[in-house]
Amino acid sequence: MFRGTLSFDQEGLRRVEELADSYGFKVTSVNAGNNFVQASRDLFEGQVKGVKMCIDAAFNLGTPVVRVFGGEPMEGKTEEECVRAIVEGLRMVASYAEERGVTLALENHGKITNNVDILLRILDEVDSEALKVNMDTGNFYWYGYSLSEVEEIFERLAPVTAHTHMKNGTAERKYERRKIGEVKLTPLPEGDINLLKVVRMLKEKGYKGVISIEDEFEGWTTLPQEKVVEILKRDVEYLRSAF
């Protein structure tokens, strides 16, 4: 479970609020880095405990959303076994989220939940009003869906989307189904996906959540800080131009 540099106790959460206020930020979600596909029951239950800790943190911060993952493939487990583990884990934490009045936003992430049919199956089988989707616009493209398929997926997921990660990239064969990872991640205005169209579509379909930037453009970890800030400011201006 990724906790950054602050603890999830009351003092740590108080510090989060202070830091957010000092920068004029609003905490829109707590991010759980869980993986329900585990080699043992003890490890699985540890993941459940970690997500519940994030739900408590969101509740105490007055934040409506916890971003969750499903899980990743594991050697020795079939895809079906992995999906069943994800469904079981999400059922356990969704019931707790319902009690706390927190929404879980399952991200399309990695090699399982980026399959949109599996993602929707998980939502259907968990069958909880507390479980929705965190729409990561770049991850479906990374997974190998063509540009037209990605646009159709966004339309399908809009009614069950509770949070977003705006991400973009370019692909040499953008109109074809590709292998996983055949994408170069770019600043938001420079990718193949028309994110302004996505943002407008979400609003038209009644989405009331935040438009969150998760720009993982190549070089973001090595460029000078001022250059990264410049690119992120351009991302913000780009998304604001949707309205």
Regions found by a protein language model. Name each.
Residues 2-8, 32-49, 71-83, 176-186, ...:
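Surface-exposed, active-site-proximal loop segments in enzymatic domains
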Residues 13-23, 37-133:
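Active-site acidic/histidine proton-transfer and metal-coordination neighborhood
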Residues 30, 88-192, 196-200, 243:
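Acidic/histidine-rich catalytic cores of soluble enzymes
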Residues 26, 64, 162, 208-209:
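Short acidic/polar active-site loop segments enriched in Thr and Asp
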Residues 223-243:
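C-terminal helical cap(s) of enzyme catalytic domains, especially alpha/beta-barrels
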Residues 212-216:
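Short acidic/histidine-rich active-site segments
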Residues 20, 58, 104, 136, ...:
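Conserved, mostly hydrophobic/aromatic
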Residues 1, 33-36, 70-74, 110-112, ...:
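Active-site-proximal loop/turn and secondary-structure-junction residues that shape catalytic pockets
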